[in-house]
A protein has these predicted regions:
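Metal-dependent nuclease catalytic cores that hydrolyze phosphodiester bonds in DNA/RNA
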Residues: 56-196, 303-308
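Conserved catalytic cores of phosphodiester-cleaving nucleases, focusing on short active-site segments
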Residues: 197-223
Length: 311
């Protein structure tokens, strides 16, 4: 059975949009690396070689989140998984959690308010019924069937309103966000690998990218713990790379952090050069792991096979 990461010359030709003879010439010229199990066996081309020979120009665009998800390429979330292990990368994607849905609502709330619109135009509070009862379930199902707006729990709805109020009171928000491009999608190549990112706010006149985060604790101590737990350093570096691919320069990267419960404090942070450099190494290692996987060179997909001493 042929390895899914290896293509025959016909498949490679189709992927590259050239003839089979052209693929053979590229192999003979050393432009494409191929694998043979023995001298007379057919050439098999690693998927990584196809990606390397189908370059894409860095570009910026606007699209829906669903359209962005359909784009081929590694994003910050996948890089974070690769940084843990190949098995984490290969695992099934996480489903959207309630906290993620709340995060989307905050973004929408900001955009609606900047446009002079009400949050209620797009979101509505779920009816206060006991869905454990037949009558309550029927009433809720009827509400869902006729409601076109996004439904939130009452506490989440109120949290989003108060979080937005807090964000709008922060001076850094008004310095950057009103003139920024919102949810800019960037596609580019990293060392021959297709890459993508979706930036919350990017303001080219002041060369700044802002990522909005909700957190339980927006204090310096609390958010530093979140950076470690959620690998936000990798995200910051990845977004800086994305921005540089289309503008030619690296931006200042800021996290706009707002607490998701009272008192809804808001704070802005940037990462030290040491943290960004550490993330650079993590990303480079993750990309090398990914390329080795595409080339069929990975035999262990976990952490390590030897005994490791911890201290």
């Amino acid at each position: 059975m042929q390895d899914a990461n290896l293509l025959n010359t016909s498949q490679a030709a189709q992927a590259l949009g050239v003839s089979v003879d052209q693929v053979r010439r590229m192999i003979n010229a050393g432009q494409i690396r191929s694998i043979q199990t023995h001298e007379r066996s057919p050439h098999l081309i690693p998927t990584a070689e196809i990606l390397r020979n189908t370059p894409i120009k860095p570009r910026s665009s606007r699209m829906s989140f669903d359209e962005y998800c359909e784009l081929d390429g590694l994003n910050a979330s996948l890089i974070k998984r690769l940084n843990k292990s190949l098995n984490h990368y290969l695992a099934a994607p996480l489903e959207q959690s309630a906290s993620m849905a709340k995060g989307v609502a905050i973004h929408d709330s900001i955009e609606l308010r900047l446009a002079g619109k009400s949050f209620a135009e797009k979101y509505v509070v779920a009816p206060n019924v006991d869905r454990r009862t037949k009558a309550g379930k029927e009433e809720y199902d009827k509400f869902v069937a006729t409601e076109t707006r996004t439904i939130l729990k009452e506490e989440d709805y109120n949290d989003v309103i108060l979080m937005t109020e807090s964000i709008f009171k922060h001076p850094e928000f008004w310095r950057i966000v009103p003139d920024a491009e919102v949810e800019q999608v960037i596609t580019w190549q990293e060392n021959g690998i297709r890459a993508k990112a979706r930036l919350d706010y990017s303001c080219e006149p002041i060369q700044t990218v802002v990522d909005l985060k909700s957190a339980q604790d927006a204090s310096p101590y609390g958010f530093k713990k979140a950076i470690t737990r959620y690998s936000y350093d990798i995200q910051a570096n990845w977004y800086r790379r994305a921005y540089q691919s289309v503008t030619g320069h690296y931006p200042e990267f800021l996290f706009l952090v707002v607490e998701n419960s009272e008192p809804y404090n808001c704070a802005v942070y940037k990462l030290s050069e040491e943290l960004l450099h550490s993330a650079e190494l993590k990303i480079n290692n993750s990309l090398e792991l990914y390329k080795a996987y595409l080339n069929g060179e990975i035999y262990s997909k976990g952490y390590h096979e030897d005994i490791m001493e911890l201290s």
